[in-house]
């Protein structure tokens, strides 16, 4: 008998670390994107909680009139927010070490940039982590493609829009009422309701909700009963079972007769792809719309587009919306300027027709 001795292969610490990071056997998959995702999201979350509770007022408009957003300064859950960085900072990168002191950094709204930039890095890494885990499990990549829609939307309102407007003070505040304020001001300045891409986004979100409700109710109504009348139908399903849990033929026949034949899918895979595609494309288009309006390519303007034979304006809903927009714009940053830009930017009126003679 011959005995063969082989030298044991030594595995370096780095190789063991790589194996642990990319292992799909972990209860929570980490992945290389996770190495960036976990610290950035933890940083953003920690700073957000602290700032929402205790951040001092921020000079958002850059006119030495601080706005309080935290709970300890008199706000509640509805009115509280992390106030965007000061207009005095503009679009400049403003980390802690760029300020003369922590007090100055807080006064100028530094936490907003810290939270937003770490959050965007974190959600982008989460999207990459979805692709990475799908790749390691041999799955198709559609999960990360679908998640790219909310990532694009967040990037549009937190990064692209401030860049286009020239200041992080124009970004969306991190709070409930601040979000509503952002929406009203956005409508006032860009007429987003009349932008085709926003219309597509509304169709995507509401259409996706409708299709989801229709699909869920159809499936629930056509479940194959595996239990008695005294038990919940949910007990008739076993996780991982191979047979269908609902009768797609019955659901197809019902919906085809309710609407018309070709309104109903007869292919389960095509149906679920459509359910994913519709809202994702809608949110993609909305993010594109916000990103173009960031550079003032605004919604359609049909103001005073209907006149009578005498040239007098016949008001339409477009004119009523325009009047509402002007009212909202007047209320926005009311101490930073006297008039909205639409009212202040008229034709230049000459004050002096000739230059005065100066006798020296």
UniProtKB/Swiss-Prot annotation:
| Catalyses which reaction(s) | 2 a plastoquinone + 4 hnu + 2 H2O = 2 a plastoquinol + O2
User: Where does the chain bind [CaMn4O5] cluster?
Assistant: 170, 189, 332-333, 342, 344
**Record keyword Lyase present:** no
* Keyword Metal-binding appears in the UniProt entry: yes
Q: How is the cofactor bound?
A: The D1/D2 heterodimer binds P680, chlorophylls that are the primary electron donor of PSII, and subsequent electron acceptors. It shares a non-heme iron and each subunit binds pheophytin, quinone, additional chlorophylls, carotenoids and lipids. D1 provides most of the ligands for the Mn4-Ca-O5 cluster of the oxygen-evolving complex (OEC). There is also a Cl(-1) ion associated with D1 and D2, which is required for oxygen evolution. The PSII complex binds additional chlorophylls, carotenoids and specific lipids.
Annotated SUPFAM superfamilies:
Bacterial photosystem II reaction centre, L and M subunits
List the residues marked with site Tyrosine radical intermediate.
Answer: 161
Residues that, per the record, bind pheophytin a: 126
Query: What are the alphabetically sorted keywords of the record?
Result: Calcium, Chlorophyll, Chloroplast, Chromophore, Electron transport, Herbicide resistance, Iron, Magnesium, Manganese, Membrane, Metal-binding, Oxidoreductase, Photosynthesis, Photosystem II, Plastid, Thylakoid, Transmembrane, Transmembrane helix, Transport
Primary enzyme class:
oxidoreductase
Where in or outside the cell it occurs: the entry states: Plastid, Chloroplast thylakoid membrane
Q: Where is this site: Stabilizes free radical intermediate?
A: 190
One of the record's GO cellular component terms: photosystem II
Superkingdom to which the source organism belongs: Eukaryota
Q: Which residues bind Fe cation?
A: 215, 272
| Positions of chlorophyll a ChlzD1 binding | 118
Propeptide positions, renumbered to this chain?
345-360
Q: Where does a quinone bind?
A: 215, 264-265
Q: How is it modified after translation?
A: Tyr-161 forms a radical intermediate that is referred to as redox-active TyrZ, YZ or Y-Z. C-terminally processed by CTPA; processing is essential to allow assembly of the oxygen-evolving complex and thus photosynthetic growth.
Please provide, alphabetically and separated by semicolons, the GO molecular function terms listed in this UniProt record: chlorophyll binding; electron transporter, transferring electrons within the cyclic electron transport pathway of photosynthesis activity; iron ion binding; oxidoreductase activity, acting on diphenols and related substances as donors, oxygen as acceptor
General function of this protein: Photosystem II (PSII) is a light-driven water:plastoquinone oxidoreductase that uses light energy to abstract electrons from H(2)O, generating O(2) and a proton gradient subsequently used for ATP formation. It consists of a core antenna complex that captures photons, and an electron transfer chain that converts photonic excitation into a charge separation. The D1/D2 (PsbA/PsbD) reaction center heterodimer binds P680, the primary electron donor of PSII as well as several subsequent electron acceptors.
In the record, the note on similarity to other proteins reads: Belongs to the reaction center PufL/M/PsbA/D family.
The further comment given in this record reads:
2 of the reaction center chlorophylls (ChlD1 and ChlD2) are entirely coordinated by water.
- Subunit info? PSII is composed of 1 copy each of membrane proteins PsbA, PsbB, PsbC, PsbD, PsbE, PsbF, PsbH, PsbI, PsbJ, PsbK, PsbL, PsbM, PsbT, PsbX, PsbY, PsbZ, Psb30/Ycf12, at least 3 peripheral proteins of the oxygen-evolving complex and a large number of cofactors. It forms dimeric complexes.
How is this protein named in the record? Photosystem II protein D1
